[in-house]
Amino acid sequence: MKESEDIIINNQNRCTLHPNKNLEFLCLDCKFMPCCSLCTSRKGEHHGHKTDSLESSASNIHSLINDFKDNIYPKLIERKENDQILLKESNETFKEIQSQNDDNNNLLKNEFKQIHNILSFVELDIEKQLSTNLDQNILINTIITSSINNDNKIISTILNNNNNSIIDKLNYFTQINNQQDNDDNDDCYQIDTDTIELIKQYQNSLLILKNSNNINNLTKLKEYNNQILKFDNQTINNIKNSFKSIYSFGDIPNDAIDYNINNNNNNNNNNNNNNNNELNNSNNKNEFIKILNHNFYIYSESDESSFLTDDFESLAFKDNCNILSKLKKLPNNVLLLSGFNQKLTKGIIPEGVKVLYIGDIKQELIIDSIPNTVTTVGLWYGFNQKLTKGIIPEGVKELRLGDIKQELIIDSIPSTLTTVILCDGFNQKLTKGIIPEGVKVLYIGDIKQELIIDSIPNTVTRVRLLDGFNQKLTKGIIPESVKELHIGNIKQELIIDSIPNTVTTITLCDGFNQKLTKGIIPEGVKELYIGNLKQELIIDSIPNTVTTVRLCDGFNQKLTKGIIPEGVKELYIRDIKQELIIDSIPNTVTTVILCDGFNQKLTKGIIPEWVKGLCLGDIKQELIIDSIPNTVTTVRLLDGFNQKLTKGIIPESVKELYIDDIKQELIIDSIPNTVTTVRLLDGFNQKLTKGIIPEWVKELHIGDIKQELIIDSIPNTLNNVYIYKSCKKLIYSFVPVNVKIVNI
């Protein structure tokens, strides 16, 4: 027992730095630090310091003990507490890293699954094209083979009847016939069964030689299409190289924004598309986040003065938003970042704020958290608050929902809302009543839960399916209340009845990539907007019931005869990319509107002779004589029209001319003598010198024109001048006395 106690005592007396040496000294220069002989040796930390041996340092040991008690011990306690805090933070940070790693792996799998799907779709599409081509060639081969076999069967019957050669029979018949001719006895000529058979075979032979099977087969032979599949190795290499840039690793700062905001607004599709938050530095040194084309400047207490003195349209807050009550001018748009930890009692967000975006905030929302002046609310990725009735006030008209974490229930969304936007990643089941019946407009991105009948309420009249939308649209998913449908680059194939017959207007946005076979667009559709489609239009893609077609900027399809069906009456054309040809516009079209940016040559016949009304915007190709057919009776020159109107450009068939704010000066003969009615509309800004309005004009309508009239601006051959309320110029003194003035 004594020996073990000695071992413990000896171990306790050992130097921590040099375990083989005993503690012998106290260093007087280092707050009585205990030392061994090695500590004080030439290479030791305390070499040259003043020391006392432990045995002769009673007073120093008392000082050491007191310092241990009063100073060192409390610091040890504090150190232990700090270490626990640090350990907790370390574990929490590591837990977040593990969680982020799981998210990263899930994202990796999901993204590459999409890439694999895309490649699979491409492979299937190529296989389908190969199969289609083979099927067409099989059909050609079958037709040729069947035709030839049928002919050969008949020919073989003729040539080899009863195992006797036809030529032998013919020779025999000729011999017999010659004998009968010598006998010169036609009346006694006997037609036996062999002769009848030869006559029949002769008929069959003539029919075979007369039919066009051989010619048809030669034609069919040329229809064979032997395709060779080629891959563009340069493009493949570019794709391979581009894969290296599809991802990046970025460090997440402590105050990072941990959610994404999707901007799916298409403009037209516009074309829209998903914008992640971007943390930026502006010219005024404040950090900002870009959301939906707004820069949300992140409030910092260290720079409060700049926020108090400057005006900000959009502000973002990390911890609290108390400064809002101090600002001389409220921002219209407010963003509460993830981690925001202030209880939003009434008035914290003052009235006057119009748009409120909320991330993963930490305090519960209550009634009056959101002021009544807010008209747009966005609940973004990670939002984790219960939305009971009244949380979203009735003043809100538009609601954007990302991947929120709490389940929506009936009354989560107030019935006063008119617009709901379901952003990419939204992951809630939409059972009946979740989207209330007051909603009129619904945008849907790449949501993760399947739509079912009654997901969309019967009050919705406009639906926009954004790029990435990936739901099967079986009959009834889009309710019959919907009248207007916008479709972007959706991922599931449209089928007959995907679009209800009640839809009257469809917009096919840029990137739309579906084959439009007959019946996909239902016969109830009257108006069709078409952007830059990825699949070729074919005859019957557009049903005959459509009366108005609008070809938007970027439209890139060849308009051969029949693509635009004969039911169309009104055609709008913007900056399309394929050349118009004769018959591109069907003869049923009576009104053509060439909008700003239209950039096609209008040679004779492009606009067919059935067109009666023509509107011209800021078109880019010069008009020439015969660009406008002689059948047109009404022309409107829209704002921005920038063409010189020399004699003959507007044909003599025109009776009525509307003129907006055009950019080129009118000259004598710009307006033909056949025009009887001229309307100078709001914004018209051209000088009207004598003769500009020809003497054949009988009615002149004047709106808010910008140029002063002068004497002889208005010819005395007019019957009536109609002056509209919007007109601000002095008109009356320039109207000839014989012309009647009518105020409208």
From Swiss-Prot:
InterPro entries in the record: FNIP (IPR008615), FNIP_repeat (IPR052697), Znf_B-box (IPR000315)
Pfam families: FNIP, zf-B_box
UniProt keywords, alphabetically: Repeat
Classification via SUPFAM superfamilies: B-box zinc-binding domain
Keyword Repeat among record annotations: yes
One example GO MF annotation: zinc ion binding
FNIP repeat ranges per the UniProt record: 340-376, 383-422, 426-462, 469-508, 512-550, 555-594, 598-635, 641-678, 684-723
Name of the protein this chain belongs to: FNIP repeat-containing protein cigB
Protein species of origin: Dictyostelium discoideum
